[in-house]
Every structure is written in C-alpha cells, then in structure tokens.
C-alpha cells in the first residue's frame, strides 16, 4: 500500500514540462504519478488539464465568497465541481468545460465588477495550481492531502444533495 508513503516527485521531473501529472488514484504509474499522454486509468492529458482548470476555477469561486454573499446555487456548483474532479468520475472533456463555464458564470454573479475591473487585485482570480506543484515537498504534500480530502467529502455531500439532503 502506498497510503503511508510521503509522495515525492521522481528525480528530474518538472511538472511544468509534462503533458499531464496525476497522482490521485491507487493506479498511479510506478507509485510516482502518471505523466504521459494518458494515465494508467485511461484519463487523457487534456482531461487532467481540464480537471486542474476546474479546481483552479473552484478556488477562485470560493475566494469570491469570502467578502461577498453567495447565491442559492453556489454551494451546489462547488460540490458538483469538486465531485467532477474525483478519480474516475468524469473523463468527458465537454462536461468539464461546461462545469468550468458554470463556475465562472457563478463567480461573475457574485462579483460582477471583477471581470471588468481595471485595477486587478487578484482576490477572485482562478488559483494558479503551480503554486502547489512547485512548492516545498511537505507543503505540496499537505495541500494535496487537503484537496483530495475535500474532494472525498464532496462525494458524500454530492450524493446527499442528489437525495435531497443539504446542510450549511
């Protein structure tokens, strides 16, 4: 089992040069992540990039709610988006693109002036995931663990929501 191993990038791997990088599931190549055109699970590089883009957009949406009221749809969109990025849930690029668009539209409802602001503050921008992948090993591992944990919780929240149960 790889569950107790601290994740480390293979020597010489620069994530910014790879077509894809995914170490989300137990099928990960050589216990070091999938980095080619497709993962062991069948996820393509384009799908992996769209999942990262969706994650970035979701963080931007969450940041937009820090100082602004969310709408009645915000929680649903965040939960659906997180669920969509879980391992082997959705490898359909069009669905991922549509979800990214929904997240951006929701963010523009919450902070409509940010998309046309001339003095960009960055407070509601999509998050740059390079900040995670290029960071200190321990910080990267911790942030990854938190992200995967939140995605796992979103799976339960998504299924509860489908069954009609919600709770703030």
Describe the residue ranges of each PLM region:
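An N-terminal assembly and electron-transfer interface module characteristic of large anaerobic redox
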Residues: 6-168
């Amino acid at each position: 089992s790889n569950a107790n191993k601290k994740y480390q990038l293979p020597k010489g791997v620069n994530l910014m040069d790879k077509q894809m990088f995914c170490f989300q599931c137990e099928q990960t190549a050589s216990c070091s992540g999938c980095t080619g055109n497709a993962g062991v699970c069948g996820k393509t590089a384009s799908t992996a990039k769209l999942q990262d883009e969706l994650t970035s957009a979701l963080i931007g949406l969450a940041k937009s709610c820090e100082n602004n009221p969310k709408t009645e749809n915000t929680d649903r969109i965040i939960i659906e988006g997180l669920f969509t990025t879980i391992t082997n849930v959705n490898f359909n690029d069009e669905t991922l693109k549509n979800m990214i668009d929904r997240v951006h539209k929701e963010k523009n409802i919450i902070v409509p002036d940010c998309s046309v602001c001339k003095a960009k503050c960055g407070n509601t921008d999509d998050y740059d995931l390079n900040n995670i992948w290029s960071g200190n090993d321990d910080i990267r591992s911790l942030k990854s663990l938190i992200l995967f944990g939140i995605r796992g919780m979103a799976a339960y929240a998504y299924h509860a929501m489908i069954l009609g149960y919600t709770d703030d």
